[in-house]
Amino acid sequence: MNSPAPLESDAGIEAPSATAAPTGRSALLAGIHGMVVATSVGQVLPVLMTTLTSELHLTVTQAGFLAAADVGATTIAGAAFARPAGRFALSTVARVGTVIVLGANLACLLVTAFGALFALRLLAGVGAGIVTVACVIALSQNKSPARAFALAAFVQMAFGAALNVAIPFLNAHYGWSACFVVIAAFAAPGLWIARYYVRSQAPQAAASRATFTIAGWMAFAALSIAFCAIGATWANLGGLGERSHLTVAMISIAVSGASIAGPVATALTALVGNRVSSLLGLGFGSVTMLAGVTLLGFAGSSPLFYAGSVVFMFGWAVYVPYALGLTSVIDPTGALSVIATAGANGGFSLGPLIAVPAIAEWGVGAVPYLAFALIACALGLIVPLQHTKA
């Protein structure tokens, strides 16, 4: 049987076939709900870890292990289940992950010992990773993936902000485990919502596609490298401010400005994401981040530091949805998007470590130069994709 000719999208990268209809609004909303569930702990990690440290009398090291268990397990499970999940219905994958998230979070009501809590947070992370697989695949198969990921990011930030504000109240009135109960309550509708997860290809067809073509490797490497730069810059933003002789209050103003710029950029991307190609959006985000780290590198006063922080965050927020949108075009099954998300998380974690030798040799002022080189390298990997077939 002859298959239909491939459609062309994003300057030459092969798009899904005409028989693979994009998912609709219900699948979009289901994917957004899944993304919020999967990232809920990460959104409130600093406040949550502080609460656990004070209420359960944990050490800072123990709190760090809990954070690593939760977020690390989500990243590893997402990457590990990306390909195997292609053999099952997407709704089944979503339900399995949701059940694990529900059980692990509710079980936190029954424990106080560090070992038991560590095991439950590890299990919750695995569940969140499985949910991530389902929701990223659902979002990547939307007719405008960049716009879908931007909408999901905006809702994630809104939910995280609300929960961060609520945690002190919940802790004061209902105890330290109340936050996990809220997360479980928000996740519970996922058992019903899972019916709206739609895969644009049959499970076996999705599982059989080659995720890592040359274009897939290049996109994965570019996203991972870019997030090394992002992680290194963000982790050392305070040090760069001190290098510019700014006070803690001034640095806080810059961080607040950047925190506002992120949602603004995400909202704008959600509005225009369907009108701009992934490659063009990636290019704009990359160039904007390059401008931001350049300003931070030359910042000798507060105005330049403020501008650099805001511009960098704006570019970062634009870059992410378009990067995931590009992986969706390269691999319509969504598996590459899941693995690329894990690569981005890994790069963000490795970035501060990569910056350590440069800081030891040349001081914190070397970070913007390192970030510039990494972002430029990532951009160099993206540019050839306009001539590449997936």
Labelled PLM ranges:
Residues L120-F154:
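Cytoplasmic helix-loop-helix junction between adjacent transmembrane helices
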Residues I76-A113:
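Conserved MFS/SLC helix-loop-helix module at the cytosolic interface between two early adjacent transmembrane helices
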Residues L45-P46, G216-S256:
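Extracytoplasmic gate region of multi-pass secondary transporters
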Residues N142, L151-R199:
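Helix-loop-helix hairpin linking two adjacent transmembrane segments in secondary transporters
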Residues S277-A323:
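C-terminal transmembrane helical hairpin of 12-TM major facilitator-type secondary transporters
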Residues A104, G115-A124, P303-V311:
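Paired small-residue
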Residues I330-G365, A371:
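A late C-terminal transmembrane helix in Major Facilitator Superfamily
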Residues A77-L90, A265-S278, I359:
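Helix-to-loop junctions at the C-terminal end of transmembrane segments
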